[in-house]
């Protein structure tokens, strides 16, 4: 089924909405813990694609990359007022202010540009409350719902007894922002290459990106893996994570998706690359398998169990007949600062690497049926490894006008209702050429 994605870098009080569970056929009985469950089934990624996945290890490519590159952008931090920040300086309108001016019939009151918005972060600089009262509908909604409104709204939002405190930004963490919206927009939409002027208002490239990211604040997506919601991840005596939502994405699932989507299809997908409570969504760009070696069952046990003499056979998947040890380097796209130029020509400057180490579990025919992460669990000659990603997801597009239950049964929009995807899409189309009217 489809998940409605609002994941982060985001306020952790807002939960993922999904009609999927890890239980089969509505049963309350979980799958065996030693196999990937429905939440980790790679087939979830191809339900809406005319494609079939390959599972035989020998048929899977050792390297691959996305043919359509995801573009870097700011994650528009909450503490900076999200996409209402005046990123070019206080004498230039924010992306939301520009949109209101062109599309929402907003007219700035006299002296508006002399009003000072609140600065980002913990600042003692003065600001003008009248600025926020004068905002147009898109900018005001963004500031109040995705920005730093709680730092100057006269309320004790983090319930610590202090109103509008500077320290801690009234409970706003620095990682909160729109990377959950940037990631699908960057994967699915073409990067704007030129500024676009409408009715005398010029939308710079990062203005355009901010608008498109705003429309992807809630996305349609297929998700693999559960959300880990704790910073205190407990492990057993062998270093294996106990909580299934923190242990997945299953290593076998990860390898199947990585090699099929990037290796065979050239399609980017998204990951939460940190398995703790923080959510850092990133587009996955490419991979290369550094080491792939079929190993014996006893070798697999030795890699996974501190005292191999305590087990008589492989303990994590009773159907596994063959095993492989894998080391893979994965490149992902990172955020950028807002800028007035495209990044298409220096895309590699915004790639970072993770190295993963895992065991693949296979049936007798060599088809992958599961896996176990080794990252940090064993002393290895392969060097340093990253911890496994939390979940993977395949974006399908922005969700139109999602609503949530508000106070007294009211229906509240979950993303900015004053920004139109079709209007922003038209701006993006114009931004592909300097000559389009």
Segments predicted by a language model, with ranges:
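Sec-dependent signal peptide recognition
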Residues: 1-2
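C-terminal motif of bacterial Sec signal peptides marking the signal peptidase cleavage site
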Residues: 5-8
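Bacterial lipoprotein signal-peptidase II cleavage site
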Residues: 10-16
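Active-site-adjacent structural elements in enzyme catalytic domains
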Residues: 17-154, 159-437
